[in-house]
Structure formats: C-alpha cells, structure tokens
Amino acid sequence: MIKSIWLVNKYAMPPQYESRLRTIKFAHYLQEMGYKVTIFGSSVMHNTDIDLIDDGSKYIKRQYGDLSFVHIKSCQYKKTAGVHRVWSDIQFHYRLVKLAQKFEKPDLVVATTFPLISNPLLKYCHRHGIKYITEVLDWWPDDFVDFGLVSAKNPIMKYLFKVAQNNYVKSDATVFSIKGCYKYFEDKRWDTFHGGPVDLSKVYYINNGVDLADFNKWKDENKIDDDDLKSDTKKVIYLGSVRLANNVGQFVKAAEQLKERKDVQFLIYGDGDDREPLIMYCEDHHLTNVKFKAKWIEPKYVPFVLSQSYLNILNYTAHFGKYGISSSKMFQYMAAGKPIVCNVDIMYSDILEHQIGICHDMKDEQEYADAIRSILDMPQDEYEAMCMRAQAAARDYDYPFLTKQMVEVIEKL
C-alpha cells in the first residue's frame, strides 16, 4: 500500500512565493487524507533572483506550515529558456538522485519535471522498486516546434520526442493537466491502437485548479490600497507573464482601440521580456488607459486584485490551446466570479463550456477589442449571470476535489 510520497517539481516553491499551486495543494490535501508527503524543489525561486542556499550546501530541509520541503541546490538562470536553465534542470534532477539515499525511501514518486535529455529519477525508481507517476503540465518538447523555434524533423527534436515517449511508456501512470492528452497521443500515433507503445489506460487527466477556501479567505483578509483598483472604472485585468508565448502586445493594441472610453482601465500585472518594450509602446502612443502594475504579486493578494476586475484576460499566441490549457490563473479568474476573454481558440474550452466569456482566435486587435467591448456593454443582468456561472465552474476545479482524483490514480497502482 502506498503511504509515503515524494512530489518532485523543480519549480515548486514555498507558499509565500508560489503562484503555481498544484504541487503544494496536492501535498496539503494528500496529507489530510493520510499520506506522508515530501516536496522536492530547487533552491532557486523561478523568475526571481532568490536562492535559498548560499552556503555551499547541496540541499536544505525546510518546513512551511504542514509542507515538508527539500530544496536541492541548483544554478541560477535569468531567461525563461536557454543554456543556464537547461543546465539547472539537469543539475537538479541528477543531484536529487545522487542525494536520494539520504532521505526515507518513498512508496511513490510523482514527478512534475524531468530534464529533457533523460530521466535519472525514473531509472532510480525502477532500481529501487518505487512506483512512478509522470505529471505533464505543458507540451515540452513540442513547444519548441509550436513556437516556430525549430523543425519537428530536427535530429535533436526527434531525440527529445523519443525521450518523452519513453518516459510515458516506463511510468506506472501519467497524469496530464491538459484535457486533450488522449488526442495528443493519437495524433502522434504513439498510442497502442495506432501501433505505438503508449497504453492510454495508464494515462489520466487532472487539470490545475484553485483552492476556494484559501481564495475566499485571502480575498477578504489581504487587500491592497491602490487607487486604480478602487476607481469606478471597469477594470480589464491581465495577470501573468509578459513574454513571447503570452502575446500581450495584441492585448495592448486591443486596448488602444478602446482608448476613447473613459469608463475602462486596462491593468497588466506580471513581468517578462516584453514588459519594457510594451511600456515604451504605451508611452509613445499616449495610451493612458493601459497601466503596467506590479511585476509580481504575492499569492495572498491575487484574489483581492482579481475580485476588483470587471473582466479578466487570457492571452496567448495562435494555436497555443490546440489540446486545451491548464492555466492556473484561469481557475483563479473563475473563483473571482468575473467573465474571461481569451484571444485564441482552445480545445475543450471551459470558457465556452460554462458560458463564462469569449474564447476564439482573434485575427487582429480590432476583433479583440470588439470581444472585450461586448462584455463591457453587456446588459447588467446578463453580466451578473455570467459572473455566477464563473464561480460555479470553479467548484469543479477546487483542489480538495482534484486531490481525490489523484488518489484514485494512486490507488490503481
């Protein structure tokens, strides 16, 4: 019987830094259900300059409330992709395997990350009779191809695809946070029905979510004194990275189409390579209706910020959601009880399924602006009904419910 679990996620961080809540919420609720859980994450806090280890130690143990962490020393990196980040990933996973004997042997490892070139932790688990679940939260290495960075026929990509496929085959189970995972395997013809090696009976779908108890508590207890949030304008909020994959420039240009409206304010929270160029664009084009706010918000303040919006934005490059999405902020948007506009077509769209906004490919900024305007000018009774549907939809993605789904997978091993 499985009782002791390692949750391995290089990017898992202590609660005060963590905006991607999946790992720490699973840890919390798995423990409530009787499991012993240890989280293994990097010493480096992603997208920050913070390194929790500064004395040459290979690892440190830390307790954050009921969360038991082991932070593995990893090298710093500045960019979201690049040699230093790849090396940091490799270093973390190989160092974890080297140090593994220092910790109590688990019955199960749930690994959310592994270095692209190989998977030493999976091999370690096989050698020591430990069950292994792969968690997949994005489409690496496919993103390299989807963003046009490299051809799928590139020899390196062929190797990386083979590594990923082998990982799915040799894991005891694979849990995707993206609903289109089954179609993904079918399209690649990796599933056994199409002659491939991947048994889809060992593949499961559990999306990301939101902890509604925390969200509602934090919304009431952690408020920000901010004139923009207190204003009577209808606030259209984007929260997230400001980089290539998020295509925030299209959102800014859509806001430009609405610059004559004095009743609307566009607020952008987040950081990334595109932030400064977009700030300059707004200054050059005198866009006073667009404001770039904090580069980073402590998670406990996010619920209040989103609760002050009139409309929230999901923004991506074309074709991003071809198998669905698992954006944590989408579920926070739902919990805030506000409509959502997304600028790309998403397969298995929760926005369309629950009728809580607009979601389709926006061919240009004018079409994007028209979509935003349609929510802003919606009759009040229709708007309030949409808000209520958003809150109701969030219940399907409450972390206690999602954890029960994970336990069902664990009990099948």
Task: Show which residues each predicted segment covers.
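Membrane-proximal helix-turn-helix segments that form the acceptor-binding/catalytic region
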Residues: 25, 97-98, 118-127, 154-176
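Carbohydrate-associated surface elements
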Residues: 180, 209, 296
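A short, well-ordered alpha-helix in the C-terminal region of glycosyltransferases
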Residues: 381-396
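N-terminal subdomain of nucleotide-sugar transferases
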Residues: 1-61, 179, 256-258
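Nucleotide-activated donor-binding/catalytic signature segment of Leloir-type glycosyltransferases, i.e.
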Residues: 269, 276-304
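Conserved donor-binding/catalytic core segment of Leloir-type glycosyltransferases
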Residues: 175, 210-212, 227-246, 251-255, ...
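Acidic donor-binding loop of glycosyltransferase active sites
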Residues: 172, 304-323, 338
